[in-house]
């Protein structure tokens, strides 16, 4: 890629990765057909599709519509080689226990951003009556009599554990009460999807969710909402280049914390006919401190992308990472481009205002890779981001996405489906 001045143009934001994946896991609960419209064609979705196919699910694509026929599940084992590259594979724990009353699944993988233990998932399944055994590299679960509703209070708010408990609760006998739930928009979208499938759920969007097993599950057609992190990435790329862009099909309510920081830096935006119109020409103010927090706080997935923007802003800014301990590993790569960042524990001090210069850098995880693209678009000269496959896990054709906004960018090898 090459810095080419301010980004300008309009893009339609893709469907949400973090909403689509749990919906795909939920599809196996029902002995029927599930159709997802606006489903992103990205590497993580393709990997989840391959896992479902290995279980016996028939799938078909038409543009951005994914059809999943789950009438016949032939297999309840998912080997480690299919799960170690994607964290969301653990969501099949709750849905497969609900459907088949047993599962054998390899430990999930994903981005190397820090410890993400599955103990909260396993404890929730145990409280619902499943017998869980952990062997080297595998989790084995059984519930011969089926799952039972339970009162589960999560020790810490966890998106994945909340999703797994919701999936298990769809078929569990009686009522299930979840407390200290994650409140991310993707949790809310999953609840609405499960309601469409037939589950009775109350408390959507709160930290306390009540649900009762579905009397009967039914076929579902559902539209995946837009991806708030992709929208935030485009917005912050415009901020880094002082551009003016329009983002179609976004919900600003899901982006409040991201937009608040954007405004503090001097950016302006408005909603007009369902389109977010952003003018970043006035970006010039550092931010005193931004701390990543569970929703509705500032998302950890946007932290490294914000860091890339702050390097272009004169003055000193601070970021505190409270979620994952390895989310500052991008600093070494940004320094190759001339960025000045000092890290102490969970705190990073960004000394911004110097012109970044193009360099060969290496993506180590999804959002850090996207941040390097944002930095490269604001840099002088040409930049090369190695291991772009990390970026393609969450961004559909990133070269086309940023190309529509005037960026000079290309990918040498691309994930296709």
Model-derived regions: residue spans:
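Short, structured segments at the rim of ligand-binding sites
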Residues: 1-417
């Amino acid at each position: 890629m090459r810095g080419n001045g301010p980004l300008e143009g309009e893009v339609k934001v893709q469907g949400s990765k973090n909403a689509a994946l749990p919906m795909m896991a939920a599809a196996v609960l029902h002995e029927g057909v599930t159709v997802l419209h606006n489903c992103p064609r990205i590497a993580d979705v393709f990997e989840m599709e391959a896992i479902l196919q290995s279980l016996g699910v028939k799938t078909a694509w038409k543009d951005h519509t994914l059809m999943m026929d789950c009438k016949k599940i032939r297999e309840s084992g998912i080997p480690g080689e299919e799960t170690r590259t994607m964290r969301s594979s653990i969501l099949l724990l709750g849905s497969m226990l609900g459907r088949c009353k047993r599962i054998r699944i390899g430990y999930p993988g994903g981005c190397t951003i820090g410890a993400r233990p599955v103990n909260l998932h396993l404890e929730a399944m145990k409280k619902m009556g499943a017998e869980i055994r952990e062997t080297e590299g595998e989790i084995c679960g059984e519930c011969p009599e089926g799952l039972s509703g339970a009162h589960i209070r999560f020790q810490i708010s966890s998106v994945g554990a909340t999703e797994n408990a919701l999936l298990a609760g769809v078929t569990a006998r009686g009522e299930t009460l979840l407390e200290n739930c994650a409140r991310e928009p993707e949790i809310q979208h999953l609840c609405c999807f499960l309601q469409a499938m037939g589950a009775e759920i109350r408390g959507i969007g709160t930290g306390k969710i009540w649900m009762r097993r579905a009397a009967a599950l039914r076929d579902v057609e559902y539209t995946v909402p837009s991806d708030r992190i992709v929208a935030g990435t485009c917005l912050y790329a415009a901020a880094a280049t002082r551009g003016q862009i329009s983002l179609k099909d976004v919900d600003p309510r899901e982006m409040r914390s991201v937009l608040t920081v954007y405004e503090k830096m001097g950016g302006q935006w408005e909603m007009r006919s369902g389109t977010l119109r952003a003018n970043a020409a006035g970006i010039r103010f550092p931010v005193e401190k931004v701390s990543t927090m569970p929703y509705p706080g500032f998302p950890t997935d946007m932290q490294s992308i914000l860091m890339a923007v702050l390097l272009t802003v004169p003055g000193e800014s601070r970021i505190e990472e409270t979620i994952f301990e390895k989310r500052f590993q991008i600093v070494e790569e940004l320094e190759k481009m001339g960025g000045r960042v000092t890290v102490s524990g969970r705190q990073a001090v960004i000394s911004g205002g110097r012109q970044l210069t193009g360099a060969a850098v290496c993506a180590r995880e999804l959002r850090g890779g996207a941040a390097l693209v944002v930095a490269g678009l604001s840099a002088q000269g040409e930049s090369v981001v190695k291991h772009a496959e990390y970026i393609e896990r969450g961004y559909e054709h990133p070269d086309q996405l940023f190309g529509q906004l005037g960026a000079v960018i290309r990918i040498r090898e691309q994930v296709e489906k």
